[in-house]
Curated annotation (Swiss-Prot):
Biological classification of the source: Eukaryota, Metazoa, Chordata, Craniata, Vertebrata
The family this protein is said to belong to: Belongs to the G-protein coupled receptor 2 family. LN-TM7 subfamily.
Protein name: Adhesion G protein-coupled receptor E5
Site (Cleavage): 428-429
Disulfide bond residue pairs: 32-42, 36-48, 50-69, 75-89, 83-98, 100-121, 127-140, 134-149, 151-170, 393-423, 411-425
Residues that bear Phosphothreonine: 713, 724
Chain spans, region GPS: 393-441
Record keywords, A-Z: Calcium, Cell adhesion, Cell membrane, Disulfide bond, EGF-like domain, G-protein coupled receptor, Glycoprotein, Membrane, Phosphoprotein, Receptor, Repeat, Secreted, Signal, Transducer, Transmembrane, Transmembrane helix
Glycan-carrying positions: 39, 44, 115, 136, 285, 327, 372, 403, 418
Amino acid sequence: MGGPHGGPFLLFHVLCFLLTLSEVGSQNSKACALPCPPNSSCVNGTACRCAPGFISFSGEIFTDPLESCDDINECGPPSPVDCGSSADCQNTEGGYYCTCSPGYEPVSGAMIFRNESENTCRDVDECSSGQHQCHNSTVCFNTVGSYTCHCREGWEPKHGLKNKQKDTICKEISFPAWTAPPGIKSRSLSAFFERVQKMSRDFKPAMAKKSMQDLVGSVDDLLKNSGDLESLDQSSKHVTVTHLLSGLEQILRTLAKAMPKGSFTYRSLDNTELSLVVQEQGKGNVTVGQSHARMLLDWAVAAAAEESGPTVVGILSSQNMKKLLANASLKLDSEKLKETYKSPVRGAKVTLLSAVSSVFLSNTNTEKLDSNVSFAFALHEQPELKPRQELICAFWKKDSNGNGSWATTGCWKMGRGNGSITCQCSHLSSFAILMAHYDVEDPKLALITKVGLALSLACLLLCILTFLLVRPIQGSRTTVHLHLCICLFVGSAIFLAGIENEGGEVGTRCRLVAVLLHYCFLAAFCWMSLEGVELYFLVVRVFQGQGMRKLWLCLIGYGVPLIIVGISAGAYSKGYGREKFCWLNFEGGFLWSFVGPVTFIVLGNAIIFVITVWKLTQKFSEINPDIKKLKKARVLTITAIAQLFVLGCTWVFGLLLFNPESWVLSYIFSILNCLQGFFLFVLYCLLNKKVREEYRKWACMVAGNKYSEFATTTSGSGSSHNQTQALRPSESGM
């Protein structure tokens, strides 16, 4: 570089190089006939080619000046790029690269690579490395490529969160709040819930097993020594049992979540059994069994859709629940039963034959299951079924008022054998096996009853009008007959209009009807007893008695039944009204408030009539008997005995009318009831000569004919007149 010609020589060479480049560029520009888009190059001066990693719509080489070269997505399908497992492909402008998926790291240390052969990704254990973000209420569990946060044992996710998620936050399992049902006043129930509250305060998840055993024992004590629970009305009992069943299901479901995984069975001293299974949801079926019941269901049914974690399946079976379920109603499938028995079914009397088994699952949405659940319930009795009886699979259905009743919708009996009944149900609740005795309505009997009562009412009305309007027969015995017919008329009218309790609930209307029927029919028997007393004054007391005054007759005839009904209603007002009929309740011997007085009256009248017949026999055996007067007295006695027989027999069968098993006797009662008013009309009106004369007179007056009364010649002796006066012929007339 130090020679004299060095500088000019170097400058000359630089100028020559620049001129050469200018010439080459000029030649290339002149060689390409069209402008090429970005990411492309000219080919042979007439076309363009996209750079590697780009592609045009027309292909690799194109001549369209409007064409463009777009990036090829090597990571999208279809693509020959394979980064291998646990790796993700990342597309770039004109290329791509591979990286390990989240939760994985490269063993080689190279963060990017080109294909599967260079893949060295392996799982990262976030739990052991401390890279997790689990809350301190959870435990970290590593998974392939990730991790999950599980609630600690005895803990559950907070409301709105799920278990086994990265954001899971848990709280310690607590004893659910459970208080007494509102409106139920019972010392036994209050003491039970005080014990429950103490369990709640002392509860620890680690002691869940003991807490469940204590809870079952407390329920046994409540039901075994029910105390004042027995005195509750039927509706309150059913509200109580509904509250107990639903509360037990909720608490046992919650406490079971704190139990270790596996099976658990507990049997109390009172034969109440608790069986449950706690485990991760499996595939196929799960079976839970005990001596009272066995259950088979799909794991998918048992698991809760909104929760993840151990699944709970359990059964609690109690025999003591039947104390609160006595006389519980059964909701019937009326159309199906009508088709079966070819006649409407008004109701059913049920008998509990098994323990009451309550089912609880992790899944709380059990009103409509995806697959049916199978049950086998052990029977405590092996009944022989009679006509109109059936064994049914029933469940306890809660209504909107907190009450409940038995129902069969969604449950089917599959078979019977080996002392058990198998069932299938499409929902879950509390189940039991019932023997239902159906009350099948007999249309013929209903028609006979309605027509017969209408006929009886018509005849009784004629009797009442006759006793009021026919003056020749007025007297104390006619007064007795009048009020007897009035009582029977009012009672029969109420019976015809209001005896049926169609709603099923015993309300004020039904109780009032039962009270009125009780009073009217008791009053009828009281007036019948007064006729026996009248006969006693007439015949036994040497034919000189003048009978009882009307005031005393009314006080006794209406006052005595009023006292009996008043005492009965005051002592036990709930004894009036039944589920199907507005009549006296059979429970607790309340029916004796009617049967007792009626039995006493019938027996008393029978004794009076025996004495009367005996006295008449003595009179006939005298040396100079007054045959005419004795014959009339005998007629009165015979009619009174006939009346006692008809009324007494009618109500002997009438008491059986309300027993669904006595449908044959119900026919007898209906027929006798039809003849009751007709018999009194014939006996005291049509067979009475004076009444017939009045009827004939009225008929002629209506027809417009003049009535002629032919006087009969009688002996004018004073003795004959005195005898007639003594017997009060205006009342006999026969």
